[in-house]
């Protein structure tokens, strides 16, 4: 039996852009040929694609690092370097992707073939042909390729099911799924026979169909991690209707109504929104002695919790083993699904603003200035660091261009205001230089 894995932590790194080239045209009969260095190729992006054939995140158990290839360097004759191919990572339907550092949801992948760029490849550096001007017709300037984005991610699989079966262990959830669908869950006369979610397609006599999930049994304290805990509670979140299965024969010695209250408390504690989903109470094992008396007592206790303004949940008496009452239950479930919309899984505040992430923020902070214990001034900031890594420090003209960019950003003036003096050391990353006032 293959293992069921529904969470994973991975890292992804997009490819770096290829470096631009410094080259000059040198051909017979072409005097003053000018610059001829081409741009570097784009780095490969990391793209997640949904594959309906996958059922778990098992592929990520041992393969946790995904790195796309870098673009090729620019070439002479103004030719661009070859762009790297994107790295396609296949994930199962129902995979939620979060930023591990912020906890924000990046994307929710539910449709077969759906694709999302998770880490964007760096752009290629410009070759010297791009920097030619009337004042400098033969520039010895080329950019390094831009680094690709790097992210730490948390993947979470929540199976796609219209209906979820919940209840204590051994109340008959797996048996119910096995008789109303072609699913073959493991069934046994002991607790936690079901240790992974099972999914089956149900078709009613009237022709309606829906996906039903049998989830591992819950016990008191599950929302705090007791038993199988929250490990599988997450799979209920995508369901639109909950079938709350109760052993009305009380064969385990528990009170059916207390079971009902206890499970609902766990659902509410785990995620308050789960209680927004309509529930149908499935009174199972009604072919057993005392089940009828227990059902009467159950209904009496349940009625005390509702008033004239709140409708009692629907209750269906069934016996999965004897195949009794199943048709009415399934028809009612299909009718309830037809008038129940999808539920929002996340608040907007939980979602990453991808436009802002990919550089369309209204105000990007250009740089910050701090001072180390050794009195070195330290420059940081996304824009400044991006300019720095794309500067070819082996060429004087590139360094001079970077110095002009710093002045244009106001770095020199800001250093003076902070008290920097001629000859002070300034550091960007691992690169150090002297401040010249």
UniProtKB/Swiss-Prot annotation:
Domain OCT positions: 359-437
Alphabetically ordered keywords of this record: Cytoplasm, GTP-binding, Hydrolase, Magnesium, Metal-binding, Nucleotide-binding
GO CC terms in record: cytoplasm
Stored Pfam families: DUF1967, GTP1_OBG, MMR_HSR1
Gene3D superfamilies (UniProt xref): GTP-binding protein OBG, C-terminal domain, GTP1/OBG domain, P-loop containing nucleotide triphosphate hydrolases
Residue sites binding Mg(2+) per the record: 174, 194
Annotated localization: Cytoplasm
Cofactor(s) in the UniProt record: Mg(2+)
Binding site for GTP: 167-174, 192-196, 214-217, 284-287, 319-321
Function: An essential GTPase which binds GTP, GDP and possibly (p)ppGpp with moderate affinity, with high nucleotide exchange rates and a fairly low GTP hydrolysis rate. Plays a role in control of the cell cycle, stress response, ribosome biogenesis and in those bacteria that undergo differentiation, in morphogenesis control.
Record-given protein name: GTPase Obg
């Amino acid at each position: 039996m293959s293992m069921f894995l529904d969470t994973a932590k991975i890292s992804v790194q997009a490819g770096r852009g290829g470096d631009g080239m410094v080259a000059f045209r040198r051909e017979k009969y072409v005097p003053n040929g000018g610059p001829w260095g081409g741009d570097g190729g784009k780095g490969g992006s990391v793209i997640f694609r949904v594959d309906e054939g996958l059922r778990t995140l098992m592929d990520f158990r041992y393969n946790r690092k995904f790195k796309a290839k870098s673009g090729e360097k620019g070439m002479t004759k103004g030719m661009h370097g070859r762009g790297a191919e994107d790295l396609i990572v296949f994930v199962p339907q129902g995979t939620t992707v979060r930023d591990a550092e912020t906890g924000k949801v990046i994307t929710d992948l539910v449709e077969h073939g759906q694709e999302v760029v998770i880490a964007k490849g760096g752009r290629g550096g410009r070759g010297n042909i791009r920097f030619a001007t009337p004042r400098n017709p033969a520039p010895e300037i080329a950019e390094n390729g831009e680094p690709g984005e790097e992210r730490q991610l948390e993947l979470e699989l929540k199976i796609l099911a219209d209906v979820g079966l919940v209840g204590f262990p051994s109340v008959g959830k797996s048996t119910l799924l096995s008789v109303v669908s072609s699913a073959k869950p493991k069934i046994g006369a002991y607790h936690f026979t079901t240790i992974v979610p099972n999914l089956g397609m149900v078709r009613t006599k009237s022709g309606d169909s829906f996906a039903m999930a049998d989830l591992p049994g819950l016990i008191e304290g599950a929302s705090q991690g007791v038993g199988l805990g929250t490990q599988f509670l997450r799979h209920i979140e995508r369901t639109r209707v909950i079938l709350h299965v109760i052993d009305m024969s009380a064969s385990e010695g528990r009170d059916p109504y207390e079971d009902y209250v206890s499970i609902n408390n766990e659902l509410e504690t785990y995620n308050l929104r789960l209680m927004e989903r309509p529930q149908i109470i499935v009174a199972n094992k009604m072919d057993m002695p005392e089940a009828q008396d227990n059902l009467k007592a159950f209904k009496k206790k349940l009625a005390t919790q509702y008033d004239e303004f709140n409708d009692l949940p629907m209750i269906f008496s069934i016996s999965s083993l004897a195949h009794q009452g199943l048709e009415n239950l399934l028809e009612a479930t299909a009718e309830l699904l037809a008038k129940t919309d999808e539920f929002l899984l996340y608040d907007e505040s939980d979602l990453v603003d991808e436009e802002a992430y990919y550089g369309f923020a209204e105000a990007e902070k250009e740089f910050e200035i701090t001072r180390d214990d050794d009195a070195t001034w330290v420059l940081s900031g996304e824009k400044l660091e991006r300019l720095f890594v794309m500067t070819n420090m082996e060429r004087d003209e590139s360094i001079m261009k970077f110095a002009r960019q710093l002045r244009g950003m106001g770095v020199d003036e800001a250093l003076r205001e902070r008290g920097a003096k001629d000859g002070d050391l300034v550091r960007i990353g691992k690169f150090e230089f002297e401040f010249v006032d």
